[in-house]
Regions:
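Alpha-helical transmembrane segments of multipass membrane proteins
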Residues: 32, 36, 40, 105-108, ...
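Transmembrane alpha-helical segments and their short flanking loops
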Residues: 114-191
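Membrane-interfacial loop-to-helix junctions in multi-pass transporters
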Residues: 31-33, 46-56, 87-94, 125-135, ...
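Helix-loop-helix junctions within the multi-pass membrane cores of secondary transporters/permeases
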Residues: 62-144
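Transmembrane alpha-helix boundary and packing residues in multipass membrane permease domains
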Residues: 2-9, 41-45, 82, 114-118, ...
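Hydrophobic, small-residue-rich transmembrane alpha-helices and their short perimembrane loops
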Residues: 56-76, 103, 170-186
Length: 191
């Protein structure tokens, strides 16, 4: 009901066609989340960790499912710690690295901010220059490092990304109604 209420003013102002656009931007974000997780994490755990990517994802499945349903990186820490220990990580190392990663390893948030900034620019008919796109990449990366690991924090930092390239902050209203759906995917990548 809450998401429906948030979407009503957006649909009233932009027409029902915005629903298809929101579905497409959600699809784009989730494709980016999956590609990032599969490519980056598989290469990292395979190359640096010496663990089979399949074994890694299977071992992390409880944490992945909890992160997806809770949308909280910090809330997932106990399960994440348990999963990493079962995969062979030493408790001393995992208990240091995981809380640090829950704060500064927000790749999903950076992806979300980049996708949403481009979507908002498109909705407003603003054509971004290469310089503006690079600024989005830089500010999204910096914002993701400083984002709290709690539900909805990425949307707050999106305002900074939009401001950095002169996009209207009002555009956040376009994605606010479906932010929870974005948040589930980005948190899964963040853990």
């Amino acid at each position: 009901i809450g998401v429906f209420c948030l979407l009503c003013p957006v649909i009233a102002a932009n027409g029902p066609a915005i629903i298809g656009s929101l579905a497409m931007v959600l699809l784009a974000a989730y494709i980016c989340y999956v590609v990032h997780a599969v490519v980056v994490y598989s290469l990292t755990v395979g190359t640096l960790g010496g663990v089979s990517p399949l074994k890694f994802f299977k071992g992390m499945l409880p944490a992945i499912m909890f992160a997806f349903s809770s949308a909280s990186s910090v809330g997932t820490l106990p399960i994440n710690l348990e999963c990493t220990e079962k995969l062979g990580a030493k408790r001393e190392i995992a208990s240091f690295v995981l809380p640090l990663g829950a704060t500064i390893n927000m790749d999903g948030t950076a992806i979300y901010q980049g996708v949403c900034a481009i979507f908002i620019a498109s909705c407003y008919g603003i054509h971004l220059t290469l310089s503006q796109m690079l600024t989005i990449v830089l500010t999204a990366t910096l914002a993701s490092i400083g984002t709290a690991g709690v539900p909805g924090a990425g949307m707050v930092m999106l305002a900074m990304v939009l401001t950095s390239v002169g996009l209207p902050v009002d555009g956040i209203a376009l994605v606010a109604g479906v932010d929870r759906i974005f948040d589930m995917g980005r948190t899964t990548v963040n853990i």
